[in-house]
Amino acid sequence: MHKVTKFAIRHLSDKASRFVPKAGVYPKGYAVGGIHCGVKKDGKSLDLAILQNTFGKNASAAGVFTVNKFKAAPVQVSKKILKEKSGSGINSFVINSGNANAVTGAQGMKDAEDMVLVTDSVLENPTNSSLVMSTGVIGNNLPIDKILGGIPKLASQHLGNTHQHWIDCATAICTTDTFPKLVTKRFSIGDDTYTLAGLCKGAGMICPNMATLLGFFVTDAPVTPSALQQILKYAVDRSFNSITVDGDMSTNDTIVAMANGAAGGEVIDNTSSCAERYSRLQAEIVDFAQQLAQLVVRDGEGATKFITIRVKDALSYKDAKSIASSIANSSLFKTAMYGKDANWGRILCAIGYADVTSANSVIPEKTSVKFVPVDGSEHLNLLVNGEPEQVDEERASEILQNEDLIVEINLGTNGGQSADFWTCDLSHEYVTINGDYRS
């Protein structure tokens, strides 16, 4: 019986504990776990994780990575392995937290490669069958001896497929997170039933492009590497690329997926003959990725609000997303939300400088803005067809007292395209957390 280690993370507040599942459904053919190996200095917090395909057949894998020019060593190593293997035969992920192994020169590259080498050896994988990820402080070399010594211990004693194993794994990738982020779901495609499990970390340095944070999806569905890559990229664009906490893009952002086919059924590919099954899987993964991405925003450093920016009736999806992103990243808007101030001028300002595709993408005389409560109560119009409304400040205050809020913008272009973007407010606590990050 492999051991489980009760997760060591900051004491969960009542707010945080709401988002940690008490149970889950998990895909067939995987073993996961996490331990403390010594990267984190407190002597107990979990800081090393492994996800392993145990099905006995090579899995398909896909990845989406940061476009930050200072790509961390593990990002470079994982991208290279994924490309060389064409997404086939990747059977494990190994992750450390507490140190990003970013901007660490030749030694950092060697350390990332050694993590892959040792993981493949102890799991009896062929060479370059593992992807490696790191997260934490930038600019310091890894305590690599502790990590390389921890990998065999984790692999031999602490991997399994119970709920606690998954919680340990999700906790071991955390840094400033206040809770481990884990989501599972079961779904059917035709007569076949499949399961998805996903975990991610992130609370600050969140403003992605191509991917964000660290995130892992695993499924027992049979999917070709090329189909998995296309689905992952599509899903990430509509989830992890549609969130922001503070406008900073990490050097280490990585989202990876693995599909081992352990549940059987017809292989899902991206050919026309498989279009229906492909579309069904894509829809499930998009919904799943959005659930995980939203947990990151809910755990935004110092955040007190979860805000959905919903842009409707844009000329294109690109315009809708760009405008939503512009609002979501506005520090003035985010601080107004923290202060419960219905300052809609900051919303219009962010709409006005958004990077859109044409002069007709935003027409002030057709633009409307409103606050939409999530409890189903009456919305509050702020701007209607370019004309300001007399705002009921008491009603605005009632709405802004809530943790969740939708800000809806209708561009009135008759283009019919829409996009959602998720963000949080910006508080005094955010400054405190990041001012003390290395201390």
From Swiss-Prot:
GO terms, molecular function: glutamate N-acetyltransferase activity; L-glutamate N-acetyltransferase activity
Family matches, as Pfam families: ArgJ
Reported modifications of this chain: The alpha and beta chains are autoproteolytically processed from a single precursor protein within the mitochondrion.
EC number: 2.3.1.35, 2.3.1.1
UniProt binding sites for substrate: T175, K201, T212, E301, N434, S439
Residues flagged as site, Involved in the stabilization of negative charge on the oxyanion by the formation of the oxyanion hole: T135, G136
Pathway: Amino-acid biosynthesis; L-arginine biosynthesis; L-ornithine and N-acetyl-L-glutamate from L-glutamate and N(2)-acetyl-L-ornithine (cyclic): step 1/1; Amino-acid biosynthesis; L-arginine biosynthesis; N(2)-acetyl-L-ornithine from L-glutamate: step 1/4
Enzyme class: transferase
Family according to the record: Belongs to the ArgJ family.
Protein's UniProt name: Arginine biosynthesis bifunctional protein ArgJ, mitochondrial
Organism (species): Candida albicans (strain WO-1)
